[in-house]
C-alpha cells in the first residue's frame, strides 16, 4: 500500500513539474510562439537597399508600402522584439522581404516602407497586404499567391497580373496598351483606368470588376464560377465555359460570343 502511495505521489510531483515547465516555455514565448527578447514597444529600423532593385518578393505576414522615389530607402516597422525576424535580402536587382521564423499570432502588424526609383515585378506570398503607387514604365509583372491584398496605382504600357490565392487585387492604371489578367483562386480583381486591350482568364471563383477600365478591345475567357464585368469601346470577344457570367458595358460594335457552360452574357445599355 505504501508503495502505491509513493508511486502516486511521485506521479503528482512529476505532473506539477511538467505543468510548470510548459507554462514557463509558453511564458517565454508569449503563448503565441514569439520569443520575449526585447520590448513590445513599436520601433522603426532603417535597412539598406540598392538603386538597382526593381524586383520585390514579399513572403509572410508583412505589410508593404511601396512608392516611387529617386532615392531608394527602406524602413522596417514593428515591435522591437520582432524586428530581428524581418529579413530583407538583396541579390542583384531582387529584394526579398520575409520572416526568418513563422509567427503564430501578431498583436500588431509588421510593416516595411520601401521607396524605389523603378519597379518591374512584384510577387506576393503570404498574408501581408501591399500598397504600391507612383510607378511607371514599359512592363510590369504582378503575381499574388497568398491571402494578402494588393492595391496598385501606376502607369505601364504592358501589365500582366496573376492571382492564384485568396488575396484581392485593386488596379488603377493610366493609358496602358495591354492588360493581361490570369485568375485561378478565389481572389477578385477591381480594375480602373484606360487600356487599348484587356484580356482576362477566369479559372477560379474570384470576380473581375473592370467596368471602370475603359478598353478598346476586350477578350474574356471564363472557365470557373467567377463573374466578369467589363467595358469595351470597339470589340468584345467572350468565351464562356464555366458557370460565371459576363456583363459588358460600352456598347461595342464588334461582338463575338462562344458559350459552352452555364454562364450568361449580357450587354449593358449605357
Map each language-model feature to its residues.
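Intrinsically disordered, low-complexity terminal regions
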Residues: 1-270
Amino acid at each position: 500500500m505504501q508503495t502505491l502511495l509513493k508511486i502516486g505521489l511521485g506521479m503528482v510531483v512529476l505532473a506539477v513539474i511538467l505543468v510548470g515547465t510548459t507554462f514557463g516555455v509558453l511564458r517565454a514565448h508569449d503563448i503565441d510562439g514569439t520569443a520575449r527578447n526585447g520590448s513590445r514597444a513599436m520601433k522603426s529600423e532603417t535597412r539598406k537597399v540598392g538603386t538597382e532593385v526593381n524586383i520585390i518578393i514579399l513572403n509572410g505576414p508583412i505589410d508593404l508600402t511601396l512608392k516611387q522615389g529617386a532615392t531608394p530607402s527602406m524602413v522596417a516597422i514593428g515591435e522591437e522584439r520582432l524586428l530581428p525576424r524581418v529579413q530583407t535580402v538583396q541579390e542583384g536587382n531582387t529584394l526579398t522581404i520575409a520572416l526568418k521564423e513563422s509567427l503564430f499570432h501578431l498583436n500588431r502588424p509588421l510593416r516595411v516602407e520601401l521607396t524605389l526609383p523603378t519597379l518591374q515585378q512584384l510577387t506576393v506570398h503570404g498574408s501581408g497586404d501591399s500598397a504600391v503607387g507612383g510607378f511607371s514604365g514599359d512592363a510590369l509583372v504582378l503575381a499574388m499567391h497568398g491571402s494578402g491584398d494588393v492595391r496598385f496605382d501606376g502607369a505601364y504600357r504592358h501589365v500582366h497580373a496573376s492571382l492564384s490565392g485568396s488575396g484581392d487585387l485593386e488596379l488603377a492604371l493610366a493609358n496602358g496598351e495591354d492588360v493581361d489578367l490570369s485568375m485561378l483562386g478565389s481572389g477578385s480583381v477591381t480594375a480602373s483606368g484606360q487600356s487599348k486591350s484587356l484580356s482576362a482568364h477566369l479559372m477560379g471563383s474570384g470576380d473581375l470588376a473592370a467596368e471602370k477600365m475603359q478598353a478598346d478591345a476586350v477578350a474574356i475567357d471564363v472557365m470557373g464560377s467567377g463573374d466578369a464585368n467589363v467595358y469595351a469601346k470597339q470589340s468584345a470577344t467572350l468565351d464562356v465555359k464555366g458557370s460565371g457570367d459576363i456583363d459588358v458595358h460600352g456598347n461595342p460594335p464588334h461582338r463575338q460570343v462562344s458559350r459552352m457552360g452555364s454562364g450568361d452574357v449580357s450587354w449593358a445599355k449605357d
